[in-house]
Regions:
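Anion-binding and metal-coordination hotspots
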Residues: 1-235
Length: 235
């Protein structure tokens, strides 16, 4: 804690010295746009660090001066409680992945199921009949939406069992199995083989492009394999 206090005081002193030089020689100095941007970020970081040092919570904390758009995202995983970088909400149609939403800030993907379904229907021009999704999507609003439009889901049933519950249970099991093998498997493939485990881009635009090309390069390879298998069967 003492070291942190000293670091904050040192940064305050350096900024004060910089402001003194600027007030005296500012007319003779020429600053780049990038310089002004970085200086503004450093000032924000100082304010945030002082607030945290005083025990106040900072909701929009900057964790990197170079990548100032990145925010800490609480994941709740055993090996990584907090992650830094883009959070992507994907949909998958017949093994092909599409980016439904991407953000460098935390968001609740559980409220995005309706958007996912609408996106799939817009892409395929076919009404969605079945949906397999993580338990975070199984909220009451999504359940009501799916029931209203006759969409079967992998969600664990709430309330009394229907007459055809055995059939529904089989369908839920199959949907969950497909999701586990296809969607979860695709995440590992994209990270291991398409450079998404460690993104080395240095700004927001190139980072988004890196993610986009990683996902869609994996899609392209999968589509080539599908065409090859289809051709082999037809031969």
């Amino acid at each position: 804690r003492m070291l942190k206090r000293r670091m904050i005081k040192l940064l305050e002193k350096l900024l004060s010295q910089r402001d003194g030089i600027h007030s005296e020689y500012g007319a003779l100095l020429r600053y780049t746009q990038d310089y002004h941007k970085r200086l503004s970020i450093i000032r924000k970081v100082l304010v945030q660090e002082k607030e945290m040092f005083e025990g106040r919570k900072v909701s929009d904390r900057i964790v990197s001066i170079d990548r100032h758009y990145v925010r800490p995202i609480v994941r709740g995983k055993e090996n990584k409680s907090v992650e830094f970088g883009a959070k992507v909400n994907n949909i998958q149609i017949d093994g092909i992945s599409f980016i439904e939403h991407l953000s460098f800030k935390a968001f609740n993907e559980g409220i995005r199921l309706k958007d996912c379904i609408r996106m799939q229907q817009k892409l395929m021009n076919v009404r969605v009949r079945c949906v397999a999704a993580d338990s975070i999507y199984a909220n009451n609003a999504n359940r009501k939406f799916c029931t209203k439009y006759g969409i079967s889901t992998s969600f664990v049933r709430k309330g009394r069992a229907a007459k055809d519950e055995p059939l529904r249970k089989v369908l839920r099991s199959e949907l969950s199995k497909e999701r586990a093998t296809r969607l979860e498997g695709s995440f590992g493939t994209q990270k291991q083989h398409y450079s998404l485990s460690r993104i080395k881009a240095r700004n927001r635009k190139t980072e988004i492009l890196w993610i986009f090309f990683g996902i869609h390069t994996a899609n392209a390879i999968l589509m080539i394999e599908k065409i090859r298998n289809k051709t082999a069967k037809a031969a």
